[in-house]
Amino acid sequence: IFSFRKETDGDFRDSRYQHNIKIIRVEDNGDVDFVLYGYMNRGVREGYCGVCVYHYSNDQNVVEEKVFIPSTESYEFLKEDLGTLSYVSTENALYLLFANKLYKINISDGTSEVLEEGIKKDDFAVSDTGAHAAWIIQEGESAGNIKEIDFETLETRSLAPSSGQSLVLNGFMNEDLVYGIVVDGD
């Protein structure tokens, strides 16, 4: 569906492989939504590094850019980040974690927003289906709390430790959040 390579008259840009594609949804009619991430070899984004969301229309045989989010992260870091979370909700919203930020991207209209910043990948977990995520808040009044989100409803809940305790995020079992309570000094 997509390539930076030219069939004829290729040049040095054809041999730069610091990008990849992640398919995020395939519909029954053959339409495909995918994310291109890393270094952009050609086109209007040539020379930039980032994440680009595309929609391929099978009926029209056309690839349309929906949104581009530039990044200073290298291809290797983007690849690792996008392996952590890339979930499409029933409302056609794509949720991505990269560059320590949780993004919501509306695939239909191409808008994007940052839902949360300062998320450490090591303190972030995603459920089996990708519909839920949780992370430990790093800064501010809520530092040390666990925040959980449901990507279908955007409902969140916050778990706070009692005095003299801290929380450890263990991950998910299916769609259920698993965390531990540690008594300070243990």
Model-flagged regions — what are they?
Residues 11-26, 71-87, 117-129, 163-176:
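Repeated scaffold domains used in trafficking and secretory/extracellular systems
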Residues 119-182:
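Long amphipathic alpha-helical scaffold regions
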Residues 1-17, 43-78, 97-117, 141-163, ...:
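Surface-exposed loop/turn elements that mediate protein-protein interactions on large endomembrane-trafficking
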Residues 1, 22-55, 83-98, 130-140, ...:
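Short beta-strand elements that form the blades of beta-propeller/WD-repeat-like
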